[in-house]
């Protein structure tokens, strides 16, 4: 398995792929295939963050935030992904994701207040976009 410094996979994942090495190899190939397209790594990481938010995957969202930061995403860009989720997925999903994102950004030292003016205001016409 490939590892990036500072981004070691969870111990349970490591144990799983040790037990099932062919699945681990297939996972690596799947990742390589998905990353071999026209999107730059930062944009791809933001898209993956949106996918994890859409599936309400808490662990996946935490990991996606860490990986987006490592790919050069700014906290404001990550928060925009969460804001976009509100219109497409509903407020409960977006609020849950906001919590997960906040937790991860605080761990990374990118503290941001929960002020209402932290992001540009959204209008009702933005909700369906």
Summary of predicted features, one role per range:
Residues 12, 29-30, 46, 63-67, ...:
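A general alpha-helix detector
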Residues 45-58:
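Amphipathic, charged-and-aliphatic alpha-helical interface segments
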Residues 55-83:
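Mid-chain, well-packed structural core segment of small domains
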